[in-house]
Amino acid sequence: MRKDETSNTSPDISVAQPASALRYHLRPPRRNDGAAIHQLVSECPPLDLNSLYAYLLLCEHHAHTCVVAESPGGRIDGFVSAYLLPTRPDVLFVWQVAVHSRARGHRLGRAMLGHILERQECRHVRHLETTVGPDNQASRRTFAGLAGERGAHVSEQPFFDRQAFGGADHDDEMLLRIGPFTHPPH
């Protein structure tokens, strides 16, 4: 059994919905989750859909810094891709946060981010960085909420302007930097 296939002893999180409560198991992605993650991201506009191969590589090479939210029926309704920056290993860079529409509005994205930060492999992380488009208010709320939970500051600066995307119809990407993380969440 591979390291990322071992049982996860962290508790499931409850995500309350108006008429019921769904329980999601948060765990590192496995190699065989790649296709389901690719499908999930395709159903989560405005996220950029990467190749299936890219998601397979994330599952294989970065499982320790990525997470899936799995429903009791085994459906993947959430995914966060992230990695430690090679030149600054105390910085976790979050690439994508995908939450299916059926699971939105219950802070699942924030819970998945917190789950990654609590892993042993990320105990040394002092900052989280991510990029967001200027109009992506849902992502901005998620990251602001995470910063508030952890008593951290959020700063913003330009990262990629639209010209960097080679003429593709793409918004500017702003870099959000959250940290430093000085204490566990309350």
UniProtKB/Swiss-Prot annotation:
Q: What is its EC number?
A: 2.3.1.178
Question: Which Gene3D superfamilies does the record associate with it?
Answer: 3.40.630.30
User: Does the entry feature the keyword Transferase, yes or no?
Assistant: yes
Pathway note: Amine and polyamine biosynthesis; ectoine biosynthesis; L-ectoine from L-aspartate 4-semialdehyde: step 2/3
Where does the record place the N-acetyltransferase domain? 24-179
Question: PROSITE patterns recorded for this chain?
Answer: GNAT
Which keywords does this Swiss-Prot/TrEMBL entry list?
Answer: Acyltransferase, Transferase
Q: Name one Pfam family in it.
A: Acetyltransf_1
Q: Which Gene Ontology BP terms does the record give? A: ectoine biosynthetic process
Q: Which GO MF term does the entry hold, naming one?
A: diaminobutyrate acetyltransferase activity
Identify the InterPro entries for this entry.
Acyl_CoA_acyltransferase, Bact_Acetyltransf, Ectoine_EctA, GNAT_dom
The organism's place on the tree of life at top rank: Bacteria
The Swiss-Prot or TrEMBL record describes its family as follows: Belongs to the acetyltransferase family. EctA subfamily.
Q: What is this protein called?
A: L-2,4-diaminobutyric acid acetyltransferase
Which organism does this record belong to? Answer: Bordetella parapertussis (strain 12822 / ATCC BAA-587 / NCTC 13253)
